[in-house]
Amino acid sequence: MGPGSGQAHTQRGARVTSAERRAALEVIAAEVTACTRGRLHSGRTKAVPGEGHMDTEVVFVGEAPGMNEDRAGRPFVGRAGDLLVRMLDTVSWKRDEVFITNVVKCRPPDNRDPEPDEIEACLPYLQRQLAVIDPPLIVTLGRHSMGRFIPGAKISQIHGTSHPVDPTTGASGAMVYAMYHPAAALRSSDVERQSFDDAAGIPAALLEARARRIGPIDVAESANGRARATEPLPLPKADHRPTPTTESITMDPAPDAPTFF
């Protein structure tokens, strides 16, 4: 069950090839690696552009790199990354089938929360990544990531729910699904339980995001015959919690699953 490429992706970006997406993401990654735009660059070991599959339908957006990410130049490594992989495992998805990035690309000192000016300095990179991948669904991890897409919301009130995305974020026509940051789940068993419950709702959120974007189609066809829905899916509401699904939501992966650093 994976959110990779397939017929559903061609519905949203038929004029953009995988090679073009790959090239565009590589350009962005190179720019992030060399970036000195924000004040965080002076204290970093490595910038963290993001990584994952160029043709995915789901992009996970965290807040900022931590110590482990700063050393590795990769998002969500260490214990938080392990927990995210476990959450993906619950819906039979693999890490390299999605794209994972952060709002801020360099580590804030002492793992503090990113400041508004630091978010603004990195924002063009996130906007371009989302515009290139053009995902139907964005999963935010943490309140600072959520705040970029749903300003003024409280994560304790809206986690596990889907919301329309403002086109100015770079993700035109997408939905956003809010979750707690895995690091918060590591600190609280209650948050961990809620996070796994929310992760179980991601496939249903993806089905609804597809339906909202491409309109009433045979969802089974869009998923290469493995998703068995035969009726048009309802459009998600702004405060809608997707109904969990037990369907296998699978699309054929691309021949390769490149990773971008």
Question: Residue spans of the language-model regions?
Answer:
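Glycine/proline-rich loop-helix segments at beta-alpha junctions forming the active-site rim
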Residues: G2-H9, G13, V91, R95-D96, ...
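Active-site and ligand/interface coordination hotspots across diverse enzymes
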Residues: M1-R79, N224-F261
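Short, charged beta->alpha transition segments
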Residues: K46-P49, M87-L88, P167
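Short, basic/glycine-rich phosphate-binding loops at helix/coil junctions
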Residues: R22, A29, P65-G66, F99-N111
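Glycine-rich, small/polar surface segments that engage phosphate groups of diverse ligands
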Residues: M67-R95, F99
